[in-house]
Regions:
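Short beta-strand edge/turn micro-motifs at domain boundaries
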Residues: 129-152
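Flexible low-complexity loop/turn motifs enriched in small/helix-breaking residues
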Residues: 1-128, 148-153
Length: 153
C-alpha cells in the first residue's frame, strides 16, 4: 500500500519548501529575489504546472505542513496561506503587499518520482510556471531539475 503524502508532514513540507525556493529564486545570484510576502494557495491543485490538466485534482495543504513551510522560509519572506487566491490580487492585477502568489500541485505518494508543478504570480507580467523534479528523504529535499515546459510572462 502506498503512503499518502499527507501522512508525512516532514516530507511534504520539505518538498514544498524546495520547490517554492527554486520557483522564487530561479538561480539568481546577484540580487535578493524574495518578495516581502509570499502568499501560498492553501489548496494544492494539479493544474499548478505549465501543462493543461483535463481533470483538476485539488487537495488541501495540511495545517502542520503549512506551519513547517512558513518556518522554513521565515528567513526569506513572510509566508501567508490563503483559502481564496483571488483575495490577494488587487484591482490593478498586482499581488497585495508587494507579494507573490504561489500555487503548488499535490505531493505524490512516497515511492514515486517526485515531480511538482508550481506557479508564481506577482502581476500581469510576472508569472512563472514550471514542473520541478525533487529528490530527497524525510525533511531534506532539493530540486534536481525541471521537466517539460517552462512558462514565463
Amino acid at each position: 500500500m502506498e503512503r499518502r503524502a499527507e501522512d508525512d508532514p516532514d516530507r511534504s513540507a520539505g518538498i514544498y519548501t524546495a520547490v517554492i525556493s527554486a520557483l522564487i529564486t530561479g538561480g539568481y545570484a546577484n540580487f535578493d529575489p524574495w518578495r516581502p510576502v509570499t502568499y501560498i494557495d492553501a489548496t494544492a491543485r494539479s493544474s499548478a504546472g505549465p501543462v493543461a490538466v483535463k481533470d483538476v485534482v485539488t487537495s488541501p495543504i495540511p495545517i502542520e505542513v503549512q506551519h513547517r513551510i512558513g518556518e522554513a522560509l521565515a528567513a526569506h519572506t513572510e509566508v501567508r496561506f490563503v483559502d481564496d487566491p483571488q483575495s490577494v490580487i488587487q484591482p490593478d492585477s498586482r499581488v497585495r503587499d508587494h507579494g507573490v502568489l504561489v500555487t503548488l500541485a499535490p505531493v505524490p505518494p512516497a515511492g514515486r518520482l517526485v515531480r511538482i508543478g508550481a506557479r508564481s504570480y506577482s502581476g500581469n507580467l510576472g508569472r512563472n510556471s514550471c514542473t520541478f523534479i525533487v529528490y530527497g528523504t524525510g525533511a531534506q529535499w532539493q530540486v534536481t531539475g525541471t521537466t517539460g515546459i517552462y512558462s514565463m510572462s
